């Protein structure tokens, strides 16, 4: 029978062997963890060094821009790179290391830093308008021909630019007495140096955004009608003897009036201008080609009202002439 003292010695030796085994495994794992940690710290130190150099370079660039009068702050201040690892149980001398990705908070902070460091000029494309000589000449000619000062032209020339495009946009404001249906919008007429064309013309309109590229001038249709009542009344009478050009111009006038449901009895007479002729001819062509007259016609026939007014004027003139003759005979 084995004595108890020998059993104690054998147990002690076995415990020492187990302790030595675990000590060896733990020391090996510490060496592996130490090397991994050192590599991680080396990587972070390189990243910090690159960030420091980039900050120095960007600071010099910002100083140069400040000297030139361009203030912009684009310093990089990203959060610390977060790489952590967790070791599993040691099995057969192998150590598995898991790297965690950055958390949501760190990602959000990094994105906020990137958005703050962006150049605000890249985020908004702002083009300062530059007035052109073409727009100034056009407004001057318009004011001279029509005979009245167009309000807001000085501020309009400062706030709108044509970007070297020799085309400008005229927005036609119809009189308040005209009730235009909702499905028909007012026409924007593009003015060139030599002719005028409609914005909706597919042959002369390479871009649908010509209105944003040119200068916009407000033209009141009521003023054009007021300035040309005599021309209208004379040319609507077919029996009067006028030249072909004047008669053609009267037809253009009538085409417009037939499409506008308004009473022109309150229009005052004035002289005719070349600019008004150009506008009226352009609107007439637009009405012939693009707008159906039935959609704009009213229950009251404008032609009939004009002819009635002409007959009333003639009757008054006849009555006055008869009265004068009777006075002379007496």
Swiss-Prot record:
It comes from the Viruses. It is a single-pass membrane protein. It is found in: Membrane. GO terms for cellular component: membrane. Glycans are attached at residues 72, 94, 234, 315. Keywords: Glycoprotein, Membrane, Transmembrane, Transmembrane helix. The chain crosses the membrane at residues 2-22. This is Uncharacterized protein L487.
